[in-house]
Structure formats: structure tokens, C-alpha cells
Amino acid sequence: MKKFGSENFERMIYINMVEQSGKDFTECLEKATKWEPGQERDDQALKTAIKLYDKNFVDDENTVIILDEIQESSAVYNQIRTFAREFHAYVIVTGSYLGKTLQPDFFLPAGDIDQLIMETLTFEEFLDVFGEYELYRKIDLYGADREEDYKRLMEYYEVYQKIGGYPAVVVSYAQEKNLNKCYEQIRKLIDIFVNESKRYFTDIMDVNLFEKLFNAIALLTMQEKKGVGDLTTELSKIAYQEDSGRMTKKMLNHAISWLQESHVIGYASKAIDCDYKKIKDNSRYYFLDMGIAHYFLSRTGASWDIVKGILAENFVYLSLRRRLLDTEEIAGIAPWFATYEKINGELVFFVRSRMDYKNYGIEVKSADGIAKTAKALLKDGKLDYLYILKGTTKGGIKQHRCTPSG
């Protein structure tokens, strides 16, 4: 962020609310906003605070103010509206754990900000790091290109599904090509997240839930394929095998909400019988980074074939989630999976298009599989089209069934 500011603006003011610069600016803000009865009010108190912090401040479009780790101060966070309305300078506000800003003393400046969510690298971005994006973009989906090109892309996919897209992890792999070093980096990132989360929880027991929750989410993705009635209850059963009285539903909900707000996990909703009018929210969880997913799935003790299948589903979930959030093409507020009550079956993903209002099914197979439920839904008219994503096939199209090459 500092590199971006220094390279694109004549002047940059960087303030990190967890460092000394944050303490200094808070002191400047307190001094600028201090008022006693009978005194005239400073209508430009925020600009006064910036000038107290940096005497060379110029309020124009050649200046950028970067406020990092904004969640550390409600007093500064609540000035975002003033920054947006009264300053000519650009203001960039960033935060790592914005779940804290849901607390009552944080005022959300709706309409005054452009929000950008920083997520881990997508597979396309991962390929771009290694100079393979153009190959990925141009390659034929049904096996018409060179065998070695498909093999090369598959090798990168197999790495990506194990290490994910956290920049520090990708840099480690780019430099050393050592998966074990990448796993060590992922472990460090998890430890940092847990340790930094301690500052936002009054009950240390809440923090101790995280490791158990990660493991419980991984196990639940393997055990339950049709969604559950109450995810909190199911996760509680896995995280604590017996009723020890150590954990309340409120604590668990708090921890889950924190993981969601911190963009560690996301959820999928269930469409009963592929009916977009019968949606049950929060029916399944997924990890929002493939490396984190692999780390905890591989520690459940499941075989690699099982883990690989769940990772393939997680990969497709992330692709659908980005498509849903970044475009107007897909219905819903979260990706959907579906059940078919007639045969007590499950479809991995169900998409209702807002472009042609057709129903699309997506079946994910890490190896060759029969996709019984998906084919039944297509045959019975519940689906208009079916995509079967599986293994290292060469793909093909048969009527309304499409199997891209793996």
C-alpha cells in the first residue's frame, strides 16, 4: 500500500493505527476536536488534525492519506464520512479484521465510500505469477490443444489446490518450489490470525474455538453432502464430542461470524429440488482460500482421494462466489447447491442464470464418476444444462451435458 501511494502521488501520509503513527494521529485528533463551552468550534477539525500530524499536508488530488488497520480506532473510523465529503486529497482506509467495526461504537458511512475486498490470489492470478495466464486463457476446453499444455496447467492447478493464494505463500513457492515450506507459511498465517484475534475477544475461550472450528468445518464437508438443519449445532457436536459445558451457542456463533467477517470461511445455500424459490441459507461452509482448505482437510486423516474431491468442490465454490459477487449473471446472495428429494440425492452446485433464466447444474468429480443425481435432475427437467467437471478427461458435449477437459 505504501509503495502504491509513493509511486502514484506526489505526497503520501501513511498512518497505521496499531503502530506509533496511529497513537500520534489519535493525539492530534483529540487536540483538534477538543472544545470548551464559550469557544468557537473548529469546522475543519479533521484537516487541523492532519496538519498537526504532518505540517506539509496539502489538500489536493496529488496527495493520498492512507489509514491502515482502521479497526483499531472507532474515533478515526467514524471520520470516514468527513474525509469523503470535505477532503480533496484521496483517502485509502484499510483494515485486517473489519468484523470489529460491527460493534455499536463504529458508524458505517454508507454511500460515502468505495469498498474493495482484498482476497487471496485466484487461480488465474496465480498462473499469471508464473507466466502461464495466456496459455490458460486460450486453451481449448475440449482437448483439442497439445497434451503437454494441458499437463502443464494441471500441474499448476495441483500446486494451487495445496498452497492457495496468500501472497506470502505464493512468493515462497515461486522462490523455492518447496511445498513443505509453503505449508509452514500457511501455519504461520493461521497462528497470526488466531493471535491477533485475541485482541478482539473478551473471552479467551472464544479464541480457543478457532482451531477446533477449522477442523470441524473440514470434517463436516466430508460427512454431510445434503446440508444440515442447524450448522451451529452440527459444528458444536464435532468440535466438542461431549457436552462439557465449556461452550455456548452464542460463543460458537460469535466465532463463526468472526471467521466470515474476516473472509476465512464462506457459506453456500441449499436449493430444494433445484427450485430457486426454495432456498435455505447457511447450509454448508467452505474455506475462502485453497491453501487453508488443504491444510485442515489433510489433517482430518481422510485419504488423498477424498481430500482431492473436496478441494475440487472448494475450487468451484470460490469461482462461483467471485462470479456472483462481481457480475450480475447469477441469482442468489451466495452459491447454491441442490438436493433432489425424489431420489434423496444431492447436486454439488446449482446455478440459476439471470442472463437466460435457465437452470444449470454443476457436478464436480476429481475422478471419473457417474453423477447419478445430476443426470436424474437433467432427465426430469429440473435442470436445463449440466456441466460435469471431472479428473483428467478430454471433455465433450452430449445434448445438454457438457464435460470440459480436466
Language-model segments: residues:
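Conserved P-loop NTPase "ATPase switch" module shared by AAA+ and STAND
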Residues: 55-76
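Conserved catalytic segments around the Walker B and adjacent sensor/switch elements
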Residues: 6-27
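Sensor-1/coupling segment of RecA-like P-loop NTPase cores
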Residues: 85-106
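Catalytic cores of nucleic-acid endonucleases
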Residues: 364-405
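Accessory nucleic acid-recognition modules appended to NTPase machines
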Residues: 175-347, 351-354
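Structural recognition of the conserved hydrophobic beta-strand(s) that form the central parallel beta-sheet
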Residues: 66-68, 90-96, 117
